[in-house]
Amino acid sequence: MTVHPVRPEFVPDPSLSQTEMEELQRDIAAAARFEDEMDVLPEAITRTGDAPDVDQTTLSTSADDRTEPPFIAGVDQAFVDDKAVSAIVVLQNGEVIERVSAVERTEIPYIPGLLSFREGGAILAAFAELETDPDVVLVDGSGRIHFREAGLATHIGVTLDVPAVGVAKNLLCGTPEQSLDERYPEGTRIPITADDSVETCPDGTVIGHALQTRQYDSPNRHINPLIVSPGHRVSASTAADIVEATADGYKLPEPTRLADSYADEAKATVE
C-alpha cells in the first residue's frame, strides 16, 4: 500500500504566485476538519510497547474493525543545497516498523506561511513510498496555527485526508494565554488563540497549545515549550494529548524525533 493524495487539487504547486498560494491555503483551511475524526482512540496512542488500557482501539463501526495498535508516523525534513530531503518514520507501540525518504528539488525560497509549497512535494513523494497506512501523522511544522489555518501539517493532512498534527518549535501567529517566556513544569498546556494575524478564524478561537513536554530539574535553566496544533481530523486538545503521549523523555515526540534523525541520515546519501 502507498499513500497518495485524496485531494489532488491541493497538491503544492511552487509555480503559483504568492497570491494564488494564499488563496489555495484558504480553500485548504475550509476543507480541513479541526475536530476528532480519527479511526483510533487517542488513549491507544502510546510512546512505549505497553498495550493501551482501553476497551477498543478503534472508533470505526465498520465490520472489519481493527484491534491492533495504531500506526503513528513522524515527518521531518533536511536540506542539501537546493534539495529537500523528506523522511517518514512509522511506529507501532513504540517500535519502528517502517522508514522511507524522498528527495525533491526546492523551487522557491523559504517564505513564512508558505512552507508547504517549498517542502510539500518531497513529503508527498515520501508518502508515495510508504507501505503502511498511518492512523495519525505528526509533522514538523505548524497546523492550524497559521495565518490562514493552513500550515504544513494541515496542507499535508487535507491533501492525503489523514489525521495530522503540527509540531513546531516557534510560534508563527496567534496569542498565547500566558507568556511563553516563563519557565513551566512538564505537562503544562497554554492555549493559543486566534487574533488579527489569523485571517480565516474568529478572534479568541483556540487554534493550538504551547505544550511543555520536558523541563530541566534546575530552576536556573528552562526548555521552551513546543507549539502544537491540529492539522486535520484532530482537535486542538487531542493534538496536545497525542504529542504528550508520544514524548519519550525528550522535548520532541518520538515519531518526529526519529524522523529528524533519519532525515539527517538520508541527507548524507544525497549527492
UniProtKB/Swiss-Prot annotation:
Which keywords label this protein?
Answer: Cytoplasm, DNA damage, DNA repair, Endonuclease, Hydrolase, Magnesium, Metal-binding, Nuclease
What does the record give as the reaction this protein catalyses?
Endonucleolytic cleavage at apurinic or apyrimidinic sites to products with a 5'-phosphate
State the protein's name.
Answer: Endonuclease V
* Originating gene: nfi
UniProt region (Disordered), positions on chain? 46-67
Site described as Interaction with target DNA, positions? 110
The EC number(s) attached to this protein equal: 3.1.21.7
Lineage of the organism: Archaea, Methanobacteriati, Methanobacteriota, Stenosarchaea group, Halobacteria
- Could you tell me the Gene Ontology terms of the biological process aspect for this record? DNA repair
Family as reported in the entry's similarity comment: Belongs to the endonuclease V family.
Instruction: Identify the cofactor(s).
Output: Mg(2+)
Q: Where does Mg(2+) bind?
A: 76, 140
Cellular component annotations (GO), alphabetically ordered: cytoplasm
Extract the Pfam families matched here: Endonuclease_5
UniProt organism field: Haloarcula marismortui (strain ATCC 43049 / DSM 3752 / JCM 8966 / VKM B-1809)
List the InterPro entries hit by this protein, alphabetically.
Answer: Endonuclease-V
- List locations, semicolon-separated: Cytoplasm
> What PANTHER family would the database entry show?
ENDONUCLEASE V (PTHR28511:SF1)
Function, in words: DNA repair enzyme involved in the repair of deaminated bases. Selectively cleaves double-stranded DNA at the second phosphodiester bond 3' to a deoxyinosine leaving behind the intact lesion on the nicked DNA.
| Keyword DNA damage included in the entry's annotation | yes
GO molecular function annotation: deoxyribonuclease V activity; magnesium ion binding; RNA endonuclease activity, producing 5'-phosphomonoesters; single-stranded RNA binding
